[in-house]
Amino acid sequence: GNNIIRKLEQDADNEIRAFVLNGDSIKSLKKLRCKIYYGDVTKKETLSLIFENTDGKEVFVIHCAAVVYIKSKYNPLVYNVNVNGTKNIVDKVIESKAKLIYISSVHAIPEQPNNELITEITNFNPDNVKGLYAKTKAEAVKYVLDAVKNKNLNACIIHPSGIIGPNDFGNSHLTQLIKEVANGKLFACVKGGYDFVDVRDVADGVVSACKNGINGECYILSNRYIAIKELCDLICDVQGRKKIKMVLPIGIAKLVAPLFEVYYSLKKQTPLFTKYSLYTLSSNANFSNEKAKEKLKFKNRNMKDTIKDTVEWMNKK
């Protein structure tokens, strides 16, 4: 969210409103030009204030509030925020005659066999994807697209791949990985990889979608496949550390994943490797971003620059 605001505030004409969960830190929004509203997307009545005084204005609602979840244990909050929260946002957007840019995920799109190219789809089904997070994102997209067809909603959908980069005050599992490698605390990595995209490139694509995104259309914002070993090597290069030599096969990592989850839970940290994250690292990550490049003028920066900027941001924090 904060990276989108950083992009939006480059245009002095933009009036920016940020919706923050009650009790959440606003450290990520410090010194940013936005008016903060507090509430909870799962409680529709708390959304009223942020939608006030929008008559006669061109309004874009960028819905990026979500619970990204990679743990094995079921968590009802994931469904409540990702699905019910999205339904509430959709209802308010329809009422206010605004345009919705819904931030989904590539995880909402079914995996293709044999490393076949994965492109945008129009029919979403939670039963066709694996993991609680993916299922909730698929259900939410289905609701958004149904509202476009049946309730006169104006919306487009963004599917980012694995988001990585600076200004992650929420300390996601990828930021946790960079931190541990940069600090020399990780002595082994796992085989496999994924498509990782710079959060600032995603922010650029999202802002472009406000004006250029077509109603009812989906756009994949991806980059390229990057092995975890390559990612770790880039981090070590930036920090001037020795590269990690031990690479564990996914099968062995899956055996110890439950222990990792308990260990990080005790430390109150985001787990690096879970059963679901390991499944993801061995899944097909061959995503096409051609549509976004053509329609949204989407671009990717070099991953080395992403890692360099992220490590520098961490060191300044």
Task: Describe each PLM feature range.
Residues 129-156:
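Active-site Tyr-X1-5-Lys
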Residues 1-2:
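N-terminal Rossmann-fold NAD(P) dinucleotide-binding loop
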Residues 125-128, 176-197, 201:
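A conserved pocket-lining segment of Rossmann-fold NAD(P)-dependent short-chain dehydrogenase/reductase
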Residues 24-30, 34-84, 92:
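NAD(P)H-binding glycine-rich loop region in Rossmannoid oxidoreductase-like domains
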Residues 84-133:
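Conserved Rossmann-fold NAD(P)-dependent oxidoreductase catalytic core, especially the SDR/UDP-sugar
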Residues 205-272, 289, 294, 304-317:
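Mid/C-terminal beta-alpha module of Rossmann-like enzyme folds, strongest
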Residues 139, 169-173, 190-211, 217:
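Substrate-positioning beta->alpha
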Residues 108-109, 132, 153-174:
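Flexible, glycine-rich beta-alpha linker
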